[in-house]
A protein has these predicted regions:
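Histidine-centered active-site loop/cap adjacent to the catalytic His
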Residues: 15, 81, 87-88, 103-126
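Serine-dependent acyl-ester chemistry module
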Residues: 1-79, 97-100
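Short glycine/serine/threonine/alanine-rich loop segments
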Residues: 31, 86-87
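A mature extracytoplasmic/lumenal domain signature
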Residues: 37, 93-94, 113
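Active-site-adjacent bridging/hinge elements
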Residues: 89-97
């Protein structure tokens, strides 16, 4: 996993650069921007619907924990850039419960998940 995370840390620099470009374009065009972090079903916790340990679940070649750690690198970049640039962000990764009723796979949302996200979004939008 260490080598994978090292590669992702390199990619994170390009990701940050892209986020900053988006912010610059929006500011230049007077567009209100809100970033959202990406939730993932897997990671720490037990799925309340299935009883599945979301850390140990094997998805492709990585465990739930490994997938969660990889995505967290990118979510942390969003959080950091939003603080530094004073851009609003809604931390869906922290606000959306880890419950399979909200997902139809590891990161794509079910209809119920989309409804929940819209609720979280409007509760937190400034």
């Amino acid at each position: 996993m260490g080598k994978i995370l090292d590669k992702d840390k390199i990619a994170q620099k390009e990701y940050k650069k892209s986020i900053l470009e988006i912010i610059d374009i929006c500011k230049a065009n007077n567009v209100k921007l809100v970033f959202l972090t990406q939730p993932l079903l897997f990671g720490e916790g037990i799925d309340p619907r299935t009883g599945l340990d979301l850390v140990k679940y094997q998805f492709h070649i990585f465990s739930g924990l490994q997938n969660s750690q990889k995505l967290e690198l990118y979510n942390q970049t969003v959080r950091q850039v939003c603080v530094e640039s004073q851009t609003q962000r809604i931390d869906l990764a922290k606000l959306l419960p880890k419950d399979s009723k909200y997902f139809f796979d590891d990161m794509h949302f079910s209809d119920t998940g989309c409804q929940k996200i819209s609720e979280v979004f409007f509760e937190n939008w400034e």
